[in-house]
Amino acid sequence: MSMKDVYNANNLWDGYLKAREGVEWKESVQKYEANLLLNIYRTRKSIIDGTYTQKPMTEFKLCERGHVRQIKVQQVSDRVVQRSFNDNVLIPRTRPKLIYDNGASLKNKGLDFGRRRFEAHLRKAARQYGTDAYILTMDFTKYYDNIQHRKLLRMYRDVLEADEYAFFKQIVHDFRIDVSYMTDEEYSNCMDVVFNAIEHAKIPEALKTGAKYMDKSLGIGSQSSQISGIYYPHRIDDYCKTVRGIKFYGRYMDDTYIIMRDKKELMAVYSDIQSMCSELGIFINKKKTRIRHLTGWITWLKINYKLKPSGGIIRKVHSSTFRRERRKIKQLHRLYLRGKITYNHALECYKSWRGTYKRYDSGTKLKKLDECFKKLFREEKNNGREK
């Protein structure tokens, strides 16, 4: 794979088809598609000529699974290029460097994969160690906001060709943060302090004059950022899996777990990880990072796990997930009363969510949520308004 594959017209076409998934209804996407062949030709020519530049990104806040995030999204024309670049260069170059148990944002992997691998490790650890073992669960603070560009680019320099590296460097450069409002002292220390994109968005635009920029942070809405987020701490993965030979280790984006028999050895590994995170500019969330006995309740990717004496696993959906869905049901009901959605639409939304979590051992809470849905929509259904 090379840059020729990136600006290949067929690959740009495929990039558009993937980039439009789920957003075909947007005006910008429809306008781009109305002149699709011409747009692909112009994009291809600009990349070949070296005149291609990204357009200004759109920023907005998104509440995802209870977390408010500042999202940066490229224009559709840039998403097409990035999709082709990621599929034909970035992923093929970086995927061989990743461990198998790094489970986010890649084909044939994802949330279910991360949970299945954790459950497999939990069972194997119980068979090998019994109940006399410990687990470290670790989380990073504002992970994407604090990925340092220079260190990220240094990693990619070893795996990308010169023209690929130059193209990727341009993508990363567009994510730098305007910090003109900082004093000279604050600016000199900004790389060593936790950056929060949500708080940065509250600062008046008049203070962001372009006088000072911070080479840190990647926008969550970009696929290149997602791939880079997986790759950035890969040396920690290699250290734990290869150097230390830890069998029961896994990572999902900024969440990590390690299962070991000896607590002191586990604490020593954690100390080494802290040092490596410090070198990378990654900040560990001390409140969410803990070492506990393997027999207690363990939370991983919003599922609560507990080992049974028989070696089986109890799996319960986290309470916050049910609270969030209850609020969503009430929102669906309000939209239904205003005529924005139909009863069948609300029902399909709920059934889709329910199908994801019915496999877990939370039957009682699911029944209560079923009753909540039926209670809110019963009157309208009985009145024949379900269509």
Description of each model-found segment:
Residues 1-42, 383-387:
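Non-catalytic, polymerase-adjacent accessory regions of viral genome-replication enzymes
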Residues 68-99, 211-241:
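Conserved pre-motif C helix in the palm subdomain of viral-like polymerases
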Residues 160, 274-282:
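A common structural junction motif
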Residues 74, 79, 83, 200-215, ...:
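Right-hand nucleic-acid polymerase module
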Residues 2, 86-148:
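Active-site-proximal segment of RNA-dependent polymerases
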Residues 55-57, 250-254, 286-287:
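Short Gly/Ser/Thr- and Asp/Glu-enriched loop/turn motifs at secondary-structure junctions
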Residues 121, 126-253, 258-272, 292:
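Conserved polymerase palm-domain catalytic core
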